[in-house]
Design a protein with these regions (language model features):
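ATP-binding/phosphotransfer module of carbohydrate and carboxylate kinases, centering on a glycine-rich
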Residues: 2-93, 133-139, 184-354
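Broad gene-expression machinery/nucleic-acid interaction feature
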Residues: 41, 96, 148
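Proline-centered loop/turn at the N-terminus of a beta-strand
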Residues: 96, 120-122, 277
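Glycine-rich beta-strand-to-loop/alpha-helix junction loops that act as flexible
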Residues: 98-104, 145-147, 276-287
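Phosphate-binding/catalytic loop of phosphoryl-transfer enzymes
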Residues: 100-200, 346-354
Length: 354
């Protein structure tokens, strides 16, 4: 059955995927901005092509599904204004801007963002930035597993397909939130003797600072805990799994299966074949081979020549690459040069905040 894609991209952003870059004959660009907005935080980066410097801006969650449209847009404006101010420019001086924001799949949400941002700025879903960081905006697949999860692929003919990204109530399988929630459920199952014993019980008690694991139910429902607060427990899931707990380890196998199912749909619908990158992005992959190895194995069965790797460049870097495409200056940014600039800016920010 023929299905309509859940997401579409402007033709300018698909130029590398379809081999239509053409010549870059416009005057050189000076300032480009990329924004990566997720359920936990928002990061904006303005690249000064003349000075070869990146200026960063920060905000809270910009996912309207998590915090509401108004608060999400406030975070977005805060981050972009901060980055633009640090670059010492006005909004109008940006040659291109791409905002990859979680939850912006619907026209209504995108319209709300555009009401407070210049119309020339391109607004796409956050997984688009991850795909660009993973593939340099060329055919391939980007996989997010952070607080939430999402998969996007672009085929050699520019066909786009997304799977996942339905939020923590309806989806987010294989994400940090999902891993944390399954860990809490496993701890409760241990407590009531309906599941195997697991060190996740002690880990949950210590992490959430509750007197007993059953007290978690009260904490979750009466406080209530936010999506991000629950997702933060995934770091303990990884620690317990690395220590050899079989229940925690099994959760990573299940998470890999969930993501592989979505990746399979994306590969099939985009008709990707041969050699192409599958880039893994997000905090959940910090668990390392515990998570990456079973996922890579599952992907190898789907596409034996796919190159699976954890992406080293942050998604906001992918958004800057897309901003160059949106500005019609596809050759103005070298991905190999952008990553060290971004790494240096992030290290500088971390030092300032400590």
């Amino acid at each position: 059955m023929q299905r309509e894609p859940l997401v579409s991209l402007p033709a300018t952003l698909l130029a590398p995927a379809v081999g239509e870059l053409g010549g870059d004959n416009r005057p050189p660009a000076r300032f480009l901005m990329g924004v990566d907005g997720g359920a936990t935080k928002t990061l904006a980066a303005v690249l000064d092509l003349q000075e070869r410097r990146l200026h960063l801006g920060h905000g809270g969650s910009s996912n309207p599904d998590s915090v509401g449209a108004h608060a999400a847009t406030d975070s977005l404006v805060k981050a972009t204004d901060e980055a633009i101010d640090r670059a010492g420019i006005e909004r109008e001086q940006l040659d291109g801007a791409v905002l990859a924001i979680a939850g912006t799949d619907t026209d209504a949400v995108a319209t709300n963002v555009r009401e407070r941002c210049p119309s020339a700025w391109t607004v796409v879903n956050d997984v688009v930035g991850a795909w660009a960081a993973a593939t340099a905006a060329r055919p391939g697949v980007g996989v997010i597993s952070g607080t939430g999860s999402n998969v996007l692929g672009v085929g050699h003919g520019g066909h786009v397909w997304r799977a996942g990204g339905w939020g923590h109530v309806l989806g987010d399988e294989g994400s940090g939130y999902w891993l944390a929630l399954q860990s809490i459920r496993a701890a409760l199952a241990d407590r009531e003797a309906s599941g195997p014993e697991t060190a996740l019980v002690t880990a949950a008690i210590d992490f959430f600072e509750v007197p007993s694991v059953e007290a978690l139910a009260t904490l979750v429902y009466t406080k209530p805990l936010s999506k991000g607060e629950i997702a933060a427990f995934a770091i303990e899931t990884a620690r317990v799994a690395h220590a050899g707990d079989e229940v925690a380890r099994s959760l990573y196998l299940r998470a890999a299966d969930e993501l592989a199912r979505q990746i399979a749909a994306v590969i099939e619908q985009t008709t990707l074949t041969g050699e192409f990158p599958v880039g893994l992005i997000g905090s959940a992959f910090k668990a390392g081979e515990l998570f990456v190895a079973p996922l890579a194995s599952a992907i190898a069965e789907l596409a034996p020549r796919a190159r699976v790797a954890v992406v080293e460049m942050a998604p906001v870097g992918g958004c800057v690459l897309l901003a160059a495409l949106a500005a019609g200056r596809p050759y103005s940014v070298d991905p190999g040069e952008l990553k060290p600039l971004l790494d240096a800016a992030l290290v500088h920010e971390a030092v300032l905040r400590d």
